[in-house]
């Protein structure tokens, strides 16, 4: 019997796979459910989102099918070999007992030496009792009397392993199922494939393609492989794209020829092969290579790491893909939250701006109409005077239309005379219309540029934000048409609109007062005389009054129509914004947190598969939500700090998951503590609770400890600059820290600072207005729930007070407060730290500005940073900053 330690370690490898497969299956199931709910319940509310964005918040079908196939695949050990004897020998070694007959007990040799092999396929499964049965692959058990049924046995009877001559075709295809109470079989099934002449390899492998994850073992009993066996290996590689573990089961000879054959087919690495621990080598592209075990004595050293890597590769690839989907959609949710928040803020402002600017435009144009009547009169007189001679010449040379003239110029009828007079009048009116309109248009040109263009752009934005409502499109288009008609004065005058016809009809009525006693001759002089009389009969005052009156009437009408249309548009936006706000709340409170938790689980699964569970060292400190331990090394990094967090409820789980996502999404920055990874410990406190282990960069000490130990002024000012740089980076990524304090600033051995503990860190669009932070460092507006990134500036001001004081002693004003509630009350009333005698005037002014009660009056960190640099250069010397850097 073989060493029982061998199957025990192999069993542990499969046990780990099955345990992690359960976590992966659960995460995938919840992920599919999540995306199904998004698709079913929010298809209508997400209609406002871009179609491309909406399609991204989904589970790609090919990825879902691949992951479903991975989690549903059961691990199998497939045993192939040069002959049945080699297969059986390997199986016995694997299980640690002589279960299959060897040597003379097994009967004749198979293959080329022993003729046609009649040994059938074997399948080993777990059961409480040892039993044998024949069954069709994947179907049902056959009623068949086996030799093993006739009495006790330790080794499977040879006749049960062989296909009998009298058996029908169904029994010939049947496989022998051997049920054993064995620890290895509790975790994995084993299949021993038959020789090629019993069942072609292609057919045998067909059953191995569906729903199994194969660990392929190939038993070698000779010095080299035959051409047929090499062909079979090529078929195996094409059918099952998994690495193969080749195992020599015979003791004699070296393995040079065998190694060369396998390396030439790229079935194993052509280099030295395995590392000292027996783990298989990997190709440069990352694809796992097969391995060669030169004896059964080394099976344990080679097979266990080989199996672990095959199983791990499969699960790591699946967990990575799943986490990629989680992160992509989570980032999209956060982007949509920003877009929805901006929509909720900007749309009411756009509506108000449109209403306000239209009012200003209306008042400006109305003022022109009221103020410039006298100017218009003078303009008309001046225009007539400058155009008079040209008008008379044009009238004199006018060719009448639709009138048949006699050769001597006499008209045919009195009706034609009226037509001639009318055409001369029209000539004068049209020329005067054009000249006056051009001058009037120039007087309001600047209004078109400064008002109408902006109004139209604003209306266009409002229209685009309601694409689902046809009514709103009609309203907005109508609104723009009104603007074009009412305010594009040049278009209205030049197009001969109703305005022109109305007041120029009055002009023609004035001209019609000219009376004719006798029908004159239609000569050039007569045309000039008619034009002269028409021009002289025009009243500039009446014309100006008529123009202004019509202008005012049109303006009033357009203004009222504009206001009505805007109200209708606003009503439509109100309903849309209500739906947007509801969706924004769902994204912040449900969608993003749920997806973040799934992302944390998939990422943690990937990390534990790749790097294992970290070992906890001594305790370094305790916080409100977790304990920090030392961790010597993890994932090739050392030393590390490990923060153990046990979320008490779903809310804390979600907050932790979002924190992890924001932190992992951040680019590396020298002023932020690096987060290396996470592991979910399901066995924490003996399995009574689940802990999340966050593994991060280990630094020397925190700022609180550093100040207690004593730091020079130069070091303290440099720390202040480091903290400002770190906060600025967070803000540039759209994040707020919300808990800047001494304990959350860590120092390295050179006393350079890094910000840690992003537990309250969130994007502005994802904040729910919750009151978080450390009371002493909390800005007054935090208590209202409405705040922005200036709360970090306030907290830095308090931190800077400690840095300038060089001590961890509480400010006197805060030390007097008996409770947290009293402290909050005093801070809201304006209570701030006192000025200490050691403070530099410029430092005091800077911290006072940072903790200003009005958030809008606090300085931007881009102003604070150069201010700190100048303070440091003044107090510590010009070159001190450069030397420190």
Swiss-Prot record:
SUPFAM superfamilies: Protein kinase-like (PK-like) (SSF56112)
Keywords: ATP-binding, Cell junction, Cell membrane, Cytoplasm, Developmental protein, Kinase, Membrane, Nucleotide-binding, Serine/threonine-protein kinase, Transferase, Tyrosine-protein kinase
Cytoplasm found in the keyword field: yes
InterPro entries recorded: Dual_SerThr-Tyr_Kinase, Kinase-like_dom_sf, Prot_kinase_dom, Protein_kinase_ATP_BS, Ser/Thr_kinase_AS
Subcellular location: Cytoplasm; Cell membrane; Apical cell membrane; Basolateral cell membrane
GO MF term set: ATP binding; protein serine kinase activity; protein serine/threonine kinase activity; protein serine/threonine/tyrosine kinase activity; protein tyrosine kinase activity
Chain residues that bind ATP: 620-628, 643
EC number, UniProt record: 2.7.12.1
This protein's record includes keyword Nucleotide-binding: yes
The reaction(s) this protein catalyses: L-seryl-[protein] + ATP = O-phospho-L-seryl-[protein] + ADP + H(+); L-threonyl-[protein] + ATP = O-phospho-L-threonyl-[protein] + ADP + H(+); L-tyrosyl-[protein] + ATP = O-phospho-L-tyrosyl-[protein] + ADP + H(+)
Disruption of the gene: reported phenotype: Morpholino knockdown of the protein causes growth retardation, as evidenced by small fins, abnormal morphogenesis of the tail, and loss of heartbeat. Pericardial effusion was evident in 5-day-old morphant larvae.
GO annotation (BP), single: positive regulation of fibroblast growth factor receptor signaling pathway
Limits of the Protein kinase domain: 614-868
Pfam families (UniProt xref): Pkinase
Parts of the chain that traverse the membrane: none
Gene3D superfamilies: Transferase(Phosphotransferase) domain 1 (1.10.510.10)
PROSITE patterns: PROTEIN_KINASE_ATP, PROTEIN_KINASE_DOM, PROTEIN_KINASE_ST
Free-text function comment from the UniProt entry: May act as a positive regulator of ERK phosphorylation downstream of fibroblast growth factor-receptor activation. May induce both caspase-dependent apoptosis and caspase-independent cell death. Plays a role in the embryonic development.
Family per similarity comment: Belongs to the protein kinase superfamily. Ser/Thr protein kinase family.
Name by which UniProt lists this protein: Dual serine/threonine and tyrosine protein kinase
